[in-house]
C-alpha cells in the first residue's frame, strides 16, 4: 500500500496517477484519506493536551488542599476528562480504520514509462524474439494430441477433480519436470536461492501481500483454518520477512520459488477443458527479489532478462509487452508480460508476468531496511517478482511449436539432458 506520509505530502501525485489509471471512484478516496488522517492527527494533539491537563489538575488539587481552597470544580473537570479522551480515542480508531481501508486499496504509483491505455488492447509491444515457423500442415490441438498419445488424461481428471484439471503421464510428465529443472538451474546459476514455500497462507498474511478483495475470487479457501491455497509462490516469498528489518549489506536477496499454483477463476476466456493453458492447478517457477529502492529498476530488467533467456533457449518465439495504465492492476509500478507464440491460436499469449512492486508490498508487510550509515534510519525496501516458467503453458507451447507433420513432438535440445537424451516424445 502507499505510505500515508507520501499521500499526505504528495496528494497531487496520487491524484494524477489515478487519472492515468482512469479510476474515477478511487479519485474520491484521496480526499477521504486526507480528511481522516487530518482528524486523527488533530485529535492526537487534543488528547495529548487533555492528558497533560489531567496531570496538571492533580497538581492543582494538591495545591488547593494546602491553601484551604475548595477543589470541587477541579474534581468535576478531572472526572470529565477520561470520557472526553475516550470519545476522541473512539473517533481516532474509526479514522485509522478508514485510512487503512483506503490505503490498502489505492494502487501503487506508476513508473513514468508505463504507457497510457484503457485496457489490454492498448498494451505496447516492446520487442519480438524468434520467428513463428511457416506450416504446410494442420497442427493438432495440443490437448487432443496429448490425450491421443497417452501423455495426458483430461477426462479422468474431470471425474476425480472437475473441469480444469489434468493428469500428466509418461514422457509429458517427465517433460514438465525437465522444464522445472531447466528453469531452476538457469536461475540458480545467477545467484538465486531455491525456495519451496508453504502451499497455504493464512488470511492476515494474504491480505498484506495483495488486494485480497480483488484476488479472493480466484483463490481456493480452506474455511475451517481461514487460510488459502497459494495462487503463486510470489505471495509466501513476499510475506516471508513480514515485520522484519534487513541490513543493507544483505540486499539484494534473490530467491526462486518452486510450487504448485491453485486458481479457482480461470479468466475471461473460460476453462481450457481439454488443454493446458487455463487450468486450476499448475506448477510455476517464480523469481522474487528484495532490494534497495535505487536498485529496483535494474533488478526489474534482470528478472525479465532471466525469463527471456529461458524461452530463447527453449526456442519458443515470444514478444515482450509493456502493460498499460488501464491493465496493470493494483500492486505493480510497472509490469512486463512475455507472450509466447501459440500456432493453433495464431497469436501470442501470456506466459510470463514480470513486476516491480516498488515499496507497495513492503509497506503492507512492514519490511524495512536499515541505512548502512545511520543505525536509526530505516526505509521501505522494494520487492519484485517474475515468472521463470509456468510449466503447463510452456508444455502447450512445446506441443504446438515443436509438433511435426506426423504428430510427433520434438523435445527442445536444452531439455534433452533432463530427458535421458530423448529427442521426441
Curated annotation (Swiss-Prot):
This protein's pathway: Aminoacyl-tRNA biosynthesis; selenocysteinyl-tRNA(Sec) biosynthesis; L-seryl-tRNA(Sec) from L-serine and tRNA(Sec): step 1/1
Gene Ontology CC: cytoplasm
UniProt GO MF annotations: ATP binding; serine-tRNA ligase activity
GO biological process: selenocysteine biosynthetic process; seryl-tRNA aminoacylation
Subcellular localization: Cytoplasm
Disulfide bonds: none
Annotated residues for binding of ATP: 263-265, 279, 350-353
Presence of keyword Hydrolase: no
Keyword field: Aminoacyl-tRNA synthetase, ATP-binding, Cytoplasm, Ligase, Nucleotide-binding, Protein biosynthesis
Keyword Translocase annotated: no
Enzyme class: ligase
Record field: catalytic activity: tRNA(Ser) + L-serine + ATP = L-seryl-tRNA(Ser) + AMP + diphosphate + H(+); tRNA(Sec) + L-serine + ATP = L-seryl-tRNA(Sec) + AMP + diphosphate + H(+)
Residues spanning the membrane: none
Binding site for L-serine: 232-234, 286, 387
EC number in record: 6.1.1.11
Principal location listed in the UniProt entry: cytoplasm
Functional summary from the UniProt entry: Catalyzes the attachment of serine to tRNA(Ser). Is also able to aminoacylate tRNA(Sec) with serine, to form the misacylated tRNA L-seryl-tRNA(Sec), which will be further converted into selenocysteinyl-tRNA(Sec).
Protein family per UniProt: Belongs to the class-II aminoacyl-tRNA synthetase family. Type-1 seryl-tRNA synthetase subfamily.
Assembly, per entry: Homodimer. The tRNA molecule binds across the dimer.
UniProt remark on domains: Consists of two distinct domains, a catalytic core and a N-terminal extension that is involved in tRNA binding.
Protein name listed in UniProt: Serine--tRNA ligase
Species of the source: Methanocorpusculum labreanum (strain ATCC 43576 / DSM 4855 / Z)
Gene (name only): serS
Amino acid at each position: 500500500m502507499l505510505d500515508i506520509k507520501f499521500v499526505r505530502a504528495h496528494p497531487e501525485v496520487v491524484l494524477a496517477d489515478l487519472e492515468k489509471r482512469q479510476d474515477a471512484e478511487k479519485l474520491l478516496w484521496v480526499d477521504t484519506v486526507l480528511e481522516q488522517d487530518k482528524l486523527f492527527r488533530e485529535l492526537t494533539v487534543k488528547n495529548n493536551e487533555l492528558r497533560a491537563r489531567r496531570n496538571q489538575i492533580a497538581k492543582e488539587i494538591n495545591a488547593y488542599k494546602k491553601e484551604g481552597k475548595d477543589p470541587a470544580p477541579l474534581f468535576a473537570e478531572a472526572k470529565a476528562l477520561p470520557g472526553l479522551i475516550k470519545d476522541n480515542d473512539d473517533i481516532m480508531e474509526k479514522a485509522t480504520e478508514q485510512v487503512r481501508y483506503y490505503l490498502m486499496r489505492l494502487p501503487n504509483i506508476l513508473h513514468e514509462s508505463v504507457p497510457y491505455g484503457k485496457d489490454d488492447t492498448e498494451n505496447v509491444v516492446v520487442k519480438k524474439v524468434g520467428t513463428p515457423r511457416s506450416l504446410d500442415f494442420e497442427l493438432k490441438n495440443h490437448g487432443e494430441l496429448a490425450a491421443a498419445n497417452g501423455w495426458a488424461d483430461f477426462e479422468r481428471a474431470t471425474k476425480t477433480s472437475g473441469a480444469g484439471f489434468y493428469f500428466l503421464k509418461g514422457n509429458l510428465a517427465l517433460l514438465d519436470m525437465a522444464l522445472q529443472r531447466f528453469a531452476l538451474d538457469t536461475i540458480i546459476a545467477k545467484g538465486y536461492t531455491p525456495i519451496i514455500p508453504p502451499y497455504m497462507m493464512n488470511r492476515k498474511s494474504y491480505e498484506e501481500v495483495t488486494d485480497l478483495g480483488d484476488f479472493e475470487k480466484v483463490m481456493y479457501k480452506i474455511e475451517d483454518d481461514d487460510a488459502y491455497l497459494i495462487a503463486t509462490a510470489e505471495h509466501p516469498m513476499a510475506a516471508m520477512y513480514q515485520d522484519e528489518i534487513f541490513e543493507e549489506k544483505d540486499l539484494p536477496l534473490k530467491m526462486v520459488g518452486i510450487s504448485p499454483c491453485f486458481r479457482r477463476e480461470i479468466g475471461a476466456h473460460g476453462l481450457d477443458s481439454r488443454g493446458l493453458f487455463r487450468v486450476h492447478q499448475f506448477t510455476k517457477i517464480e523469481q522474487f527479489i528484495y532490494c534497495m529502492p535505487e536498485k529496483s529498476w535494474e533488478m526489474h530488467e534482470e528478472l525479465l532478462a532471466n525469463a527471456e533467456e529461458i524461452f530463447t533457449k527453449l526456442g519458443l518465439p515470444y514478444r515482450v509487452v509493456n502493460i498499460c495504465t488501464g491493465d496493470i492492476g493494483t500492486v505493480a509500478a510497472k509490469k512486463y508480460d512475455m507472450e509466447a507464440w501459440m500456432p493453433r491460436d495464431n497469436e501470442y499469449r501470456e506466459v510470463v508476468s514480470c513486476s516491480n512492486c516498488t515499496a507497495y508490498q513492503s509497506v503492507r508487510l512492514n519490511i524495512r531496511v536499515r541505512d548502512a550509515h545511520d543505525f536509526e534510519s530505516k526505509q521501505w525496501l522494494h520487492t519484485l517478482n517474475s515468472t521463470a516458467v509456468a510449466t503447463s503453458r510452456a508444455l502447450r507451447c512445446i506441443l504446438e511449436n515443436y509438433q511435426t507433420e506426423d504428430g510427433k513432438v520434438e523435445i527442445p535440445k536444452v531439455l534433452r539432458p533432463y530427458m535421458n537424451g530423448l529427442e521426441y516424445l
